[in-house]
């Protein structure tokens, strides 16, 4: 009896699949949305197509405020620290901006120019206040810069009093 039921289910499924395939093949219409001329320029006549560079896009229009500066554009300081200290990067009297490799860099936080130009922090170290420190084990910079552990606590794996 079980063998007969398996045969009956198999025949029913085969019939359903066959009917589905036949109906989809006969009722499907292929619609194409191709243009008559795919290379035809669809811009209105008389318009000038110009793609300006990012430097031209920063140009100030007459009677308007200057556009926002492109954040990807490099500041070329050409070994002149005054450009970096007087620029928009400066954050007050204790600003630590300097010209490193023809770019303005913050010597207090940059891992590749920590304290001095081209002073790279080692693996696992972070530049905090111009010094390379291991934030995983430093009590004064536990887990992040300027996160001090309380008196008597140790910094382990970047957490004060771990375990």
From Swiss-Prot:
What keywords is this UniProt entry annotated with? Answer: Signal
Q: Where is the signal peptide?
A: 1-20
Pfam hit, one: Stig1
The record ties this protein, via InterPro entries, to: Stig-like
The text of the family note is:
Belongs to the STIG1 family.
What name does UniProt use for this protein? Answer: Stigma-specific STIG1-like protein 2
